[in-house]
Structures are given as C-alpha cells and as structure tokens.
Amino acid sequence: PSMLRTNSYDTICHEHLEFYSLKVVKNLLEGEGLRIIDVQMNDINGGSFAVTACKKGAFYKSNTPIINWLLNQELEMGLDTIKPYEEFAKRTLLHKKNLTDLIKALVADGKKVFGYGASTKGNVLLQYCGFTEKEIPFIAEVNTEKFGSFTPGTNIPIISEKEAKEMKPDYFLVLPWHFKNSIISREEVYMSNGGKFIFPLPEIEII
C-alpha cells in the first residue's frame, strides 16, 4: 500500500520482483498452517511492513487492532481490484513528464543539475525518465568503490561528492530521496551557499 501512496515506482527493480499486500501474506501463511500475530510498519524502500507469524495452534496473542487496521486500509484502497494500479500507472506517467520537463527546463536555462547518490532505485528513475549525461553530467556519491563508474543504461559518470561540489552545481537531483531529512541536515553548508535539492518523490519538491 505504501508504494502506491508514495508513487514509489523506483522501488520496482530487479531486487524487488514481487510486492505483497497484508491480505496476500495472510492467505499464503494460512495455507501453510500459520497465522499472523503482529505486523509492523517501517520506512524501508519507501514503506514496507514486517510480519510475525506462528503456527495456528500456538498460544501467542495477536495484535488484532493493527492487523485489522491494515487489512481495512487495503480494502478501502481497493487493492483487490485493478483500479488503484491503473491510477498508479497514470500518476507515474504524469510524474515522469513533470520531472523531465523540470530538469530539461533548468538545463535550458543554463543551470547545472547533478545527481545525488548512485543508488539502485535512482537508476530506475534515471532510466525511466530517460536522463543521460546531457541533462545530468555527473552523479555525486560517497561510496569510494563507485567512483569512476557509470550508471547502467544512462552512462552518467559517478564522482565523489567533494569533486561534484567543487563544480558548484545549482541543483542536486536526489536519487535516494527517502533519506530526505538526513540529507538536508548534512548539507546545510551547500544549501546556505545557494545550492538546492530536487526531491523527486513522493511529489517533486525543491528545497
């Protein structure tokens, strides 16, 4: 459900081949003689949940309120129908257009836009939106093992954050956008000098 709510289409990649609602997990477990006793929400990959289960006959108390709450949320979203997925597809197409229009407009205006963070999910976004070295000449990264490499499919050079900032980009397109708060906290100097960050999801935001 969280992936649909946050428009996190960048989560869909070779590392994440299947996506389950709690109702589907519940049915799978019950088919194997298990039952859900708890479910915990987390922010992993834009929003996930962790399920605790036990054998049906075990005397573990179930966290019924939270389990029923999430099941009702899924029911209200219509996850057992095609509608929310069609709406997700439409929002994804619109987001692609809006983001590509924004980046191309900034570049046409003479602004320098770099990528920030050579993440797996970022590659999904770069490829889907069709960005290349023409729009985004470099990706800034902290992992030294990635320096000198290129983003797959889009062929954008990956360099250190230090090297990227020395070129004084006007904007960074943040690819690991779900780390928004920590990125803003650690980049106060860049922002105080006039630099801006573009967070692409869940909605396009410039800070």
Q: What residues fall within each predicted segment?
A:
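Short, glycine-/aromatic-enriched active-site segment of Class I SAM-dependent methyltransferases
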Residues: 1-18, 22-24
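Conserved S-adenosyl-L-methionine
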Residues: 34-45
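Flexible, glycine-/basic-rich loop-and-beta segments that form/coincide
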Residues: 46-91
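A short, well-structured juxtamembrane/interface segment
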Residues: 91-109
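Glycine-rich adenosine-cofactor-binding loop
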Residues: 106-127
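Short internal beta-strands
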Residues: 137-142, 198-199
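Conserved nucleotide-cofactor-binding alpha/beta core module
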Residues: 144-150, 162-163
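Phosphate-bearing ligand-interacting subdomains
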Residues: 154-207
